[in-house]
Design a protein with these regions (language model features):
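C-terminal tail/sorting-segment detector
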Residues: 208-222
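Short loop/turn microsegments at loop-to-beta-strand junctions
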Residues: 20, 186-188, 205
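Cyclophilin-like peptidyl-prolyl cis-trans isomerases
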Residues: 16-174
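Bacterial Sec-dependent N-terminal signal peptides
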Residues: 1-20
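Residue-level detector of functionally pivotal "anchor" positions at catalytic/ligand-binding pockets or at interdomain
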Residues: 173-199
Length: 222
């Protein structure tokens, strides 16, 4: 647990340009979101794992409400739930991507993108009944998101014509020729997962490489 807390503290100081970018390729066009890795590591790690496994390929934006949000990722069977993760600096404003859920700590794979500011969905704002963790923001192609938001739907908010995620891919992976040393001639002490448990290198899984000079690198090996 101490390792996990330390990871959160260390990653809170990482610059924005180190954060993961994800490309959505849909039948309406393409857009990119940038994840808040350092602020909500559990949520982003869960999303990255799903993306890396191809979980969302062929999934639909199955719920669309104009001037509100577009929701996707309803794939069966759903993965295990994750703990809600909130940061006071994040809010459900226009362009942000957030976890969909049916109550506290019930999020799994479904998410939505805010078409407008929906700050009442924040954990720390009235009416305090809806709590949806923000974990990223659309950085390009938001016009495509808006186009999806304008599709015709039935009375259940389901698009008449399927809006398909043809593929969803990590677009900003870091690669290293030598994972066991860094540019400062430091040595690798251990590799841990998002929960701080010591492990060994896995493919398509976010891991944290801890070096003897105190540096921590998040690496996803392909």
């Amino acid at each position: 647990m101490r390792i996990f807390i330390s990871l959160i503290i260390i990653f809170s100081s990482i610059k924005v340009n180190s954060q993961t970018k994800v490309d959505f390729y849909t039948n309406y066009g393409d857009f990119t979101v940038e994840l808040y890795d350092s602020l909500v590591p559990i949520t982003t790690s869960n999303f990255i794992n799903l993306v890396s496994s191809g979980f969302y390929d062929g999934a639909l934006f199955h719920r669309v409400i104009s001037n509100f949000m577009i929701q996707g990722g309803d794939v069966s069977p759903a993965p295990p739930t994750i703990t809600d993760e909130f940061d006071s600096t994040l809010s459900n404003i226009q362009k942000t991507i957030s976890m969909a859920n049916s109550g506290p700590n019930t999020g799994t794979c479904q998410f939505f993108i805010n078409l407008v500011d929906n700050t009442y969905l924040d954990f720390d704002k009235p009416p305090f009944t809806s709590k949806h963790p923000v974990f990223g923001i659309t950085t390009s192609g938001f016009n495509i998101v808006e186009d999806i938001g304008d599709v015709q739907t039935n009375f259940n908010d389901v698009p008449y014509i399927d809006v398909i995620m043809d593929s969803v891919r990590i677009s900003d992976n870091q690669t290293y020729t030598n994972l066991f040393t860094d540019n400062y001639d430091s040595k690798l002490l251990k590799i841990v997962d998002i929960l701080g448990r010591e492990t060994y290198p896995h493919l398509n899984m976010p891991l944290f490489y801890i070096y003897n000079n105190g540096r921590v690198k998040k690496i996803i090996r392909k």
